[in-house]
Amino acid sequence: MKIKLICVGKLKEAYLRDGIAEYQKRLSRFCQCDIIELADEKTPDKASDAEKQQIMAKEADRIKKKLGQRDFVIALAIEGKQLASEQFSHLLSEVTVKGYSDIAFVIGGSLGLDQSIKNRANLLMSFGLLTLPHQLMRLVLIEQVYRAFMIQQGSPYHK
């Protein structure tokens, strides 16, 4: 299985990079986990709604180039479905049973995701109504992916 985290924006904070690298290392015994960073567009102060839409559309074009035609796409969006860790673990195992070998998670930039990416997604997923920096969300997501595999293994990691 191959898991891709497609993220808009560069990760600058060393402590987040270190945490993500640790979970990538842990995940290597279960799957190949690639993190793909895409350039984000600069958003001018007081950008109009039209300008924001244009920015999200440009970012969406970059995202689409990284999505495989047969990827199972999970886009993170505040309006998405909230799952308990056990449900998330079950979802990941079900995806492979359905014949998908690649799962792509998409984390948008500061403005969120363009509707075209949400439409392409097989699932919109939310980690709750809290607003988190998209850089921090990467660490939260990769930890939950690792937790999902540990749940499948019956490991005491998940308590």
Swiss-Prot record:
Gene Ontology molecular function: any one: rRNA (pseudouridine-N3-)-methyltransferase activity
Domain of life: Bacteria
Catalytic activity: pseudouridine(1915) in 23S rRNA + S-adenosyl-L-methionine = N(3)-methylpseudouridine(1915) in 23S rRNA + S-adenosyl-L-homocysteine + H(+)
Residues annotated for S-adenosyl-L-methionine binding in this entry: L76, G108, F127, G128, L129, L130, T131, L132
One Pfam family linked to the record: SPOUT_MTase
Keywords: Cytoplasm, Methyltransferase, rRNA processing, S-adenosyl-L-methionine, Transferase
Top EC group: transferase
Subcellular location field: Cytoplasm
Entry GO terms, CC: cytoplasm
EC number: 2.1.1.177
Function summary: Specifically methylates the pseudouridine at position 1915 (m3Psi1915) in 23S rRNA.
PANTHER family: METHYLTRANSFERASE, RIBOSOMAL RNA LARGE SUBUNIT METHYLTRANSFERASE H
Homology family: Belongs to the RNA methyltransferase RlmH family.
Binding partners and assembly: Homodimer.
Name of the featured protein: Ribosomal RNA large subunit methyltransferase H
Taxonomic lineage: Bacteria, Bacillati, Bacillota, Bacilli, Lactobacillales
Gene: rlmH
